A protein has these predicted regions:
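Mobile "lid/hinge" segments at catalytic clefts and subdomain interfaces of large enzymes
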Residues: 1-21, 162, 167-212
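Residue-identity detector for glutamine
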Residues: 7-11, 33, 38, 116, ...
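Gly/Thr-rich phosphate-binding loop signature of adenosyl cofactor/nucleotide-binding cores
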Residues: 13, 17-67, 72-74, 80-82
């Protein structure tokens, strides 16, 4: 629209291309703008509950379940949702516990969803998060708050362009290169690790980091 008027949504918009079009009122609400210097932890707050979205992706069923709550749901910059005016919330496809290992794992859509990907990523990321030897509170403790694991289908590293504690980079032979304290384009510390061995490799790195 070259000459769209500054009318609010719900009123008439004019342009040099289209005839006058009337847009419905979608019920947008003007809210107070706040600046956050760091990511807010998941959990219960005075005004509602903050839940995480694994890999930043919601399916239709989860969206419908959220809509059925009939609550004000807001999207945050941190792959999470803030549900207002609710005291507790649990959903199998969302993260409600700040200590859940899934909070610290990122993964691209991987194979077959992306033509550039060499490997499947999401199932591996979930397997790492559910590995008993890497859960919080157990020997070999999975990951302190600053630890992040990134599973990348290729060297592009789309899901996490910055450095992570461990970055697993999928190769054409469907094995992985392992980068420690770096991003997907950095020099690996391990090369050509098979899918079957990759969780053991991650566990070994984390155990040495935690002095186990």
């Amino acid at each position: 629209l070259n000459k769209a008027s500054s009318e609010k949504i719900g009123q008439t918009l004019s342009s040099s291309i289209f005839r006058n079009e009337s847009f419905p009122n979608f019920g947008f609400e003007e809210v107070e703008q706040k600046n956050f210097s760091q990511e807010v932890k998941l959990g219960v707050f005075n005004m509602g509950v903050l839940v995480g979205v694994p890999f930043g992706e919601l399916d239709c069923k989860t969206l419908l379940d959220l809509a059925s709550l009939e609550k004000n749901v807001r999207v945050t910059p941190w792959r999470s949702l803030f549900i207002k005016n609710i005291k507790s919330f649990s959903h199998p496809n969302l993260i409600s516990n700040a200590e859940d290992p899934m909070v610290n794992i990122s993964a691209c859509i991987g194979k077959p969803g992306c033509l550039q990907a060499n490997v499947e990523t999401r199932a591996l990321a979930q397997s790492i998060a559910k590995n008993e030897k890497m859960l919080l509170g157990k020997k070999g403790s999975f990951i302190k708050g600053s630890t992040h694991i990134h599973v990348s289908g290729c060297s592009k590293g789309c899901a996490n362009p910055s450095a992570a504690k461990i970055t697993l980079v999928g190769q054409e032979n469907e094995h992985f290169n392992v980068v420690v304290n770096g991003k997907s384009t950095d020099t690996p510390t391990e090369y050509n690790v098979s899918h079957r061995s990759i969780i053991n490799s991650v566990e070994k790195i984390l155990s040495s980091e935690n002095g186990v």
